[in-house]
């Protein structure tokens, strides 16, 4: 393969605070294999690598990757020790866990331990309020929800920490593949809510990393 087809941005984490990641969707098995080979002894995060695409990779490429089918992420180069981050991830429903896991795996790749609090959507509000003392201990919260996305405003109205909203494509009918949840997040009456694109767990993790880094490095 002509290596001009891709250029890995190894300097990205130093420059921006967010590690380089390979968006695997749309790439061929040969392209992914060449990227993994080019990474050699370095660490690399791959996102949106479906189980079907993972199975098409050459055996030696698959063997080199720590693959998580739920989040469709893979890590080359193994894990690193995780430090407490103060970042919590709140998933409205079990069906939102793939996106929540993408955020968690991205943060783990960057060396940050997170906690996922799952199935606390507002259809059973007691599930959320029962965990409110725990939620208020986090420095940053990532909220993941589909359907109507009501979790975003409710959570952001209960905690001091910044909340990053991730609408998911979970739902049907007028949920419109996550658009209803996205519009709900954007129209939220809870001030300070940060919103990323539909199903963008990686983007939410990137926002959290920047917040964390800014809080540590600046007075």
Predicted features along the sequence, with ranges:
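Short glycine-rich or small-residue beta-strand-to-loop segments that form or flank ligand, phosphate
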Residues: 22, 45, 86-92, 141-143, ...
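Short glycine/serine/threonine-rich phosphate/pyrophosphate-binding segments
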Residues: 32, 96-101, 125, 145-155, ...
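C-terminal binding/interaction regions
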Residues: 91, 135-136, 140, 170, ...
């Amino acid at each position: 393969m002509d290596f001009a087809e891709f250029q890995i941005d190894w300097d990205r984490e130093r420059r921006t605070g967010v590690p380089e990641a390979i968006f695997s969707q749309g790439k061929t098995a040969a392209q992914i294999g060449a990227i993994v080979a080019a990474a050699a002894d370095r660490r690399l995060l791959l996102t949106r690598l479906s189980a079907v695409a993972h199975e098409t990779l050459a055996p030696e490429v698959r063997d080199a990757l720590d693959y998580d089918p739920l989040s469709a992420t893979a890590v080359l180069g193994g894990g690193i020790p995780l430090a407490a981050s103060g970042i919590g991830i709140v998933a409205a429903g079990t069906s939102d866990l793939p996106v929540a896991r993408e955020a968690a795996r991205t943060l783990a790749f960057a060396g940050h331990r997170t906690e996922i609090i799952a199935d606390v959507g507002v259809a059973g509000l007691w599930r959320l309020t029962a965990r409110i003392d725990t939620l208020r201990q986090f420095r940053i919260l990532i909220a993941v929800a589909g359907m109507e996305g009501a979790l975003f405003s409710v959570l952001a109205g209960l905690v001091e920490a910044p909340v990053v909203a991730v609408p998911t494509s979970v739902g049907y009918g007028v949920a419109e593949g996550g658009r209803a949840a996205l519009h709900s997040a954007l129209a939220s009456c809870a001030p300070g809510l940060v919103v990323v694109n539909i199903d963008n767990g990686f983007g939410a993790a990137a926002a959290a990393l920047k917040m964390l880094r800014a809080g540590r490095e600046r007075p």
